[in-house]
Each structure stands twice: as structure tokens, then as C-alpha cells.
């Protein structure tokens, strides 16, 4: 385990102390838990922001040659 020194606001420190006492653990253990939990949660998929952003035929991949080279008869 790597040692890390951080600065936190006093109100956060007080809240950590209260929660640590309630759980009968250390503030450091709580911080490790909170950080690990946050890092495990996947963030929003940036591709989701594009869903519904484009107008056009629903599936151009089925007719890519027609779209790129013009319709073939």
C-alpha cells in the first residue's frame, strides 16, 4: 500500500470522523473505501451523447456501396 497525504475541508474531516466512529474503523479506511468505490463505478459512455443526434436512414451500413458510389441497378 502506498502512503498518500491529502488536504480536505474541516467539515469533511468532521463528517469522516463521525462516520469512522459509527463504523468502528479509521478515517483512512473510509477514504480508501470511498475512493475505490468511486473508481469502480463506470462513468457515462460518451457515445450515449450522440444517440439521436443524427438524421438520416436508420441503417446505412446495409447499403454503404449505394451511399458511397451511387445506387447500382
UniProtKB/Swiss-Prot annotation:
GO terms for biological process: detoxification; regulation of DNA-templated transcription. GO terms for molecular function: DNA binding; toxin sequestering activity. Disulfide bonds: none annotated. InterPro entries: CopG (IPR002145). Pfam families: RHH_1 (PF01402). The keyword Magnesium does not apply. Keywords: DNA-binding, Toxin-antitoxin system. Antitoxin component of a type II toxin-antitoxin (TA) system. Upon expression in E.coli neutralizes the toxic effect of cognate toxin VapC20. This is Antitoxin VapB20.
Amino acid at each position: 500500500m502506498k502512503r498518500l497525504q491529502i488536504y480536505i475541508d474541516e467539515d469533511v474531516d468532521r463528517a469522516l470522523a463521525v462516520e469512522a466512529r459509527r463504523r468502528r474503523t479509521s478515517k483512512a479506511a473510509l477514504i480508501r473505501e470511498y475512493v475505490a468505490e468511486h473508481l469502480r463505478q463506470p462513468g457515462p459512455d460518451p457515445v450515449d451523447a450522440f444517440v439521436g443526434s443524427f438524421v438520416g436512414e436508420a441503417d446505412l451500413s446495409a447499403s454503404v456501396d449505394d451511399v458511397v458510389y451511387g445506387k447500382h441497378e
